[in-house]
């Protein structure tokens, strides 16, 4: 109770004191009227009304001081900021945004220097943001202004002038103009800072305008009811292909407030298409291009035509579609009149964006990358030549086949040139060879017999019986040389006949230029221009004589039907190999010929899918192709296609001829066939042909000579008749008439004897004259050999002349010639009708 009484006493005392203060009055000085008017003070507050007369400035009322604050008083800093129209909250928001942008630039954009774009509205209203950002950004950057039409004043920033990547930071009042400024961005990271509302930002992220900007981060300010508090910044991105229609949905990542992220573990640029394409259906244009795309037409049970596809690219894309959760709708590429090839038509469809993907074994080239995009190469291919090659050299070439033509030339020079040193060492002179072709012929047959072992010379006058050591050494060297050569020759013939000999094939550009081939290629698909400006000299020479055809079948037809000039066709090696395997066999072409693909690649290419430019699904499909290559799935697909589509009816894989496949022949022991020995028969047939030709020429020559004699005789008889008629007035005497008849009979008799003389007798007379020329000089003086055909020179038969001949062989030769002359005289007497006497029986 004592506590209550004490409190009551204190409260009563305080109440009385307050009442006393109110009743007490004190005099204060009044404020002058000049100060009140100058500072516009309240006259009622500053006590002007209480001052009267001359003492108006002597009293004023002091302001009552209350120690307890009531309400929410503003700090002095805020009061000063309001007086100078400075918003401290906006200043803090600016610093917060600058800190957020600096954090994003340092953590996500440091590898790719950012390009900062800002429009005129942001520059004028939020100029303090740009100023602070340019001063504090920790990495290298570019910046440029956007004009009123939302176009960058410096457009070079958006083009890649080098291989370095770029990123973008945009300060825009209208987020819908982002793609107009930057265009599609599938790889670069884009940060958009906008003052628009959250609803407008969500509309932008859901629209088609943001579908081509893959790595997009949008920063929007969250509006609150109390504008004096710090407002957070919300960070958005979008999810591409959220459903089967390919639409986008906005995604909230995190927020930024008080210098930190609410969820700092979140990646601000997450990977897209982690769950695929949500069953989206891609439109694909394809054309038949084996072995990459097979177009197979079949009939179902009802008789309706069915079209199905197969091949390396089809199976690869089907595998990727299952992994990325999308479906494909393949349509056959239509034929257009304004395009020259199927690939050009597919590229036009891609540029027009009527299809999403194009596949037809398309080569990745610089020209196609200018108007469209292509995937990474999934299969290698090369441009190769196809020619008509022989499986083996013909067997009739076995005679000349063992040696090349330089060896044959060297052998001919050695053996024909060996005539002169052998003759000179044996006779120590070459005078008897000059003009005597018979002796040269004998020596030729001698060296031919040495080489072929077909003849043996054991006569007294053969070189093998010579007594001179130099001749024997020379013949011995030729004999050793001949043994080695004949051994090589016979062994090579055996190998050539029993084993196949493969001819040279065309495997390079130099082979085509050296063998004078006609070369052709396609006039569409880029083949007509790819090698036009080549700096390779052989390629430029080859392109100058290039012929262009409309299809691959036409080119292969030119190869198989080439007759006088060989033809080579340049095309895809994979396609040519399949066409040869499926359409051409040994029976279709020849038993000895085959279509050959060059081993050397004329140009190496990579095959890929065709996409529209800046397509967002290209990067994901490229990553799957690289993964399939790394894991060996593409090699597995190639083997499966080869097994299913390129298998013969017997179960074996079809083989196209190449240098290796031509040589992959199982060798086995076998007997020689007629085809193996046809060279011998052809050689014999050649001999018969030459003999028949000589016989025909002799018959024609004999008939011609006979006709000439008849014509000459008729002319002489006509001339004699004319002379007799002209001299008919002059009569011959009996002696003159008898002499005239005798000469006439002798001429007729000589003509009949010459006609009866056979070919062998004439050659025997020629041989006798030749022997006289060779051996007659040893025992007889120089005689006129020009008269040998008229008068037979008598050889010396006395013992005195024979003693003058020292050489025994020469004496034997002269005796043989003498006996030959006697025999010839006897033959002449037998053929002379005047030597016989005919009696008439009475």
Curated annotation (Swiss-Prot):
GO terms for molecular function: glutamate receptor activity; ligand-gated monoatomic ion channel activity; transmitter-gated monoatomic ion channel activity involved in regulation of postsynaptic membrane potential. Its main location: membrane. It is a multi-pass membrane protein. It is found in: Cell membrane. Residues 722-745 are annotated as: Disordered. Keywords: Behavior, Cell membrane, Glycoprotein, Ion channel, Ion transport, Ligand-gated ion channel, Membrane, Receptor, Signal, Transmembrane, Transmembrane helix, Transport. InterPro entries: Insect_Ionotropic_Sensory_Rcpt (IPR052192), Iontro_rcpt_C (IPR001320). Pfam families: Lig_chan (PF00060). Belongs to the glutamate-gated ion channel (TC 1.A.10.1) family. This is Ionotropic receptor 21a. The lineage of its organism: Eukaryota, Metazoa, Ecdysozoa, Arthropoda, Hexapoda.
